[in-house]
Swiss-Prot record:
It comes from the Bacteria. GO terms for molecular function: glycine binding; glycine dehydrogenase (decarboxylating) activity; pyridoxal phosphate binding. GO terms for cellular component: cytosol; glycine cleavage complex. Keywords: Oxidoreductase, Pyridoxal phosphate. The glycine cleavage system catalyzes the degradation of glycine. The P protein binds the alpha-amino group of glycine through its pyridoxal phosphate cofactor; CO(2) is released and the remaining methylamine moiety is then transferred to the lipoamide cofactor of the H protein. It comes from Legionella pneumophila (strain Lens). Belongs to the GcvP family. C-terminal subunit subfamily. This is Probable glycine dehydrogenase (decarboxylating) subunit 2.
Amino acid sequence: MLIFELSKTGRQAKAQIPRAVSKNYSIPEEFQRKSRPRLPACSELQVVRHFTCLSQKNFSIDTNFYPLGSCTMKYNPRGVHKAASLPGFINRHPLAMDNESQGFLETLYKLQNYISEITGMPGVSLTPMAGSQGEFAGVAMIKAYHQSRGDTARDEILIPDAAHGTNPASAVMCGFKVVEIATAPDGDIDLDELKRKVGPRTAGIMLTNPSTLGLFMRQIKEIASLVHQAGGLLYYDGANLNAILGKVRPGDMGFDVMHLNLHKTFATPHGGGGPGAGPVAVGKRLIPYMPLPVVKKTDSGYHWATRQDYPQSIGRLSCFMGNAGILLRAYFYMLVLGKEGLLRVSEFATLNANYLLKELTKVGYTAAYPDRRASHEFILTLNSEKKNYDVTAMDFAKRLLDYGVHAPTTYFPLLVPECLLIEPPETESKEELDAFVAVMKTIREEASKQPDILKAAPHTLPVKRLDDVKAARELDLNYFATHE
């Protein structure tokens, strides 16, 4: 039911908070509405019940196992949220002067240093407000670097065919042409093709390591050497940093710039359209181009660095500092776990993934790369299930919802047919993993004996199987278009 269907003329919810605006204040007539807004007329209780019921129908990390591949849906510790909500942080105004913000600035300065140590890169800017914006910032810095050297012929970015979709989008937004590099049969990047395509027009290469196939790129040092010898730079997509946290540093692999997804690796909240944060870390040669502001430390305390400090900066990406509340959560997460705790994060994440992969193959599923160990995630291919039972990966994904499990990432990466990309984060217990295996075993048995159950799934959710094509072509987004 939509909230408009609860509406009754004359019903209202009185505000219980005093108005901030004086009653004597009036909006100029030219800016005043000529008709009432079409808002539902409901009581406060109706509104609370309506949205509470909707929230109970959602899948969430707090309520369900959430093995969404390449998304690292780990638990968000409540103590971290509490620390980030201390009055000294949440009551600070974004325009507060440096001398009134020393505690806040010191915290961000320490976060910059922690990220530098984790990534093996000396420069850090916290200002990007999402992983995708951090990615854009990284590519923009690569462009600024080449332009400052007069190397304007470099107009190509190399990107593997298993990359995240944001990689080519960021490259194109910065004015580059995308050159795709194929994946070899063993899951690694095709080195021979890379050697053919790298050259004087190469500005850089964008990689995720481990890749989105759930495999660690074993020839990364050779790849770095090839690209650097050609005059290009290496960009690290931090989407899968959870797999190598404390074990391997991107800077030590030869990467020049990267972004971090705080909502993945450092347990800040996912989704909801924001807020987010995607800090960037850079090697020495890209420090002059970092987006502002960054925090610097002097004898007089902590201060915002300005364009005067970084005249070649690519500039601002957001108002103020970015999403400070998310940055604080990441800082306290690092502080709570410490160096040893962060190391265990990657160890348990890879242990969970490899255990789950092994158990799923025991009950009949096929690994996309059976000769390789998983990193923090892995891919099953349901090609044989489609051929034998006429059920698809999407059918399996929809049926999982009936068992209270959020579906894994489906049909991505595109180069694996009937693909399920599964990532069990380090916060999940062995009992939870075993329960998931039992559900997957049951669904596979259903596929072999009663495939129609899968084809019609989900059966228990308020929204059943949707007609994706019709939904895309016949948009119905306006309640009043059909309810005048």
